[in-house]
Structures are given as structure tokens and as C-alpha cells.
Amino acid sequence: SQIEQLLLIFERFGNITDHKGLQHALANYIYDESSAANVVGNIEPPTPSLTDLLHREHVQFITSLPGSWQQAITQASASLLKSGVIEPRYLQIMLDKIADEQPYIMLAEGVIIAHAGVDDGALETGMALLRLPSKIDVAGYMQADIIIVLATNNPQKHLKALAQLNEFLEFYDGGNVIRRAPDEYVLIKDFARHS
């Protein structure tokens, strides 16, 4: 089911201590989101989709390989820093986490998703994507040519976009769609078509 799929995704990003609770929360989120939106006085903004987060300013293809994986993640994060989605410390925590903890952050072959925690300097929910011309070694334990940076200051706000991204990568060969896109605008249209 959709819930089980989401649980599998979240397992990869941290230890879930209350499976039943999360399952219940996800079920409510997925099936009641539209009805919740109709409650009078509910001013909670809608949960952003993949295309809500990956605007043109947050998608960049580069033609020369950065000198290090740290530079690559810094470059991937630049638009989020510039637009005030994250503070500089969020970037530093991400880099330290990868170097020190070597978390498993590969979503698909060559595609990594770097992130820190909700209290690590994320001011709102955002996502950015950087496509490299070839794979770069990341901290000696991964090879990646597509770097996605995810930030959220709310533990639920990124779930819809993350689920859509995972589906895009898994069911539409999304990694290769990203690699083959002639430019950023075409890729954004591809995301819109599949989400």
C-alpha cells in the first residue's frame, strides 16, 4: 500500500520508534488531507508537492565537475541559502553528517538526497537539485551525479514531495530522465507530468 511504501522510505532516513503511530498519522494525512482543507478556519497551508518545491531557481545543471563532494553539496544548496530557506549552519551540519556518520542517503543509482534535521537551521520547506556532468565520490562511500538537497522545518511538510520524488525515480526511471533532460525547463516539465 501507499502507506507501507512511505514507511519504507522513511526507514531509510532515520529510526522509526513508533511504527503504528506513524502509520496512523500517514493514513490520516493521505486520506483526510482534502477533507481537512475544507474545515472552516483551517489556515494550514497545503503540503507542497515536488513541483511546488523544485522551481527553476532550485534546479541547476552544471558542465564542470566541482573539486570535491563538499563543493558539490554547497553548490546544490546555494539557491536555498540565497532564498532564505536554510541558514548557513544547515549546510555545515549536512556536510558534517555525511563526513562523520556516512548515512545511507542514496535514493536511486547515482542520486543522493542530503538533508539535516528540522532544528538544524531550516527556515521553511525547500528542495534543490544539482546535476553534475559525471559522478563524484562522496565521502568515500557513495558515487553520485545527481544531488538533491532537502530542507524542512516541519516533520510532515516534505513528505508529499519526497514520496513523489521516490515514485518518479522508482517507476519512471527518474535518474535517467534527469540525466537526459536537455535543460532545466524540460526537467521541470517532466516532474510536472509525472507528479
Where does each model-flagged region fall?
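Cytosolic covalent-transfer regions centered on His/Cys nucleophiles
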Residues: 1-195
